Amino acid sequence: MNANDLWRMLGWEFSLMVATVRLINSGLLDELPSLKIHVSHFGGGIARYLPRIRGLQDREKSGTAQIPRHSRMPREPFDHYLQHRLFYDCAGWSGPDYAAERGAEWVRVGLAELPSSQVLFATDYPQAVRQDEEVIAYVKAVCGLGSGARKILDDANAQKLIPNLKERLARVQLHAGNGVLQLAGEQGAAISTPVDESQ
């Protein structure tokens, strides 16, 4: 996987998809009912493979029900966990070229299988998408997909995932002009830390 950059092209996403399916089938989400999990990159693009995954979840039909390493099943149907227990983001599919078109297409595919109520907007800016204009075009392209896609652009889903998000963000201010990250303290005092802007 290291040769020809295959890990970055395919391995990373494949590993995310495998981890997502393993997480659901392990029963961990049943044992920890309040646990919230964020899976990046639409779970490694799991939406494209869901018809195959769903079909093979039926262990009797696939002939693996009597094999211990294959017979463990979660309490709820597989889609329950996909639709109610996991959160996803839409980063990872948009760059460095044609970010808007490719990224928006990936959002369309993801939202065809996963509910917009569980998806967070994200980009790989500045690692993969390097131009501000491409990010703006990406946002516009996602908006063009309709109201379901536009829902992922606000902060409602992030607030479900991260308790007290608005209050936490209000305490953090980045002053790019002077290279200092300021964290406002309880009494209004600030803790200043130099920021290396080259990263």
Where are these regions (language model features)?
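Histidine/acidic residue-rich metal-binding segments in metalloenzymes
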Residues: M1-Q83, E101-S117
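Short, flexible loop segments at the rims of nucleotide/cofactor-binding pockets, characterized by
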Residues: F14-L16, C90-A99
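Short acidic, gly/pro-rich beta-turn/loop elements at beta-sheet edges
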Residues: Y49, Y98, Q131
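Mid-to-C-terminal alpha-helical segments outside catalytic/metal-binding sites
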Residues: S26, L35, G45, F87-Y88, ...
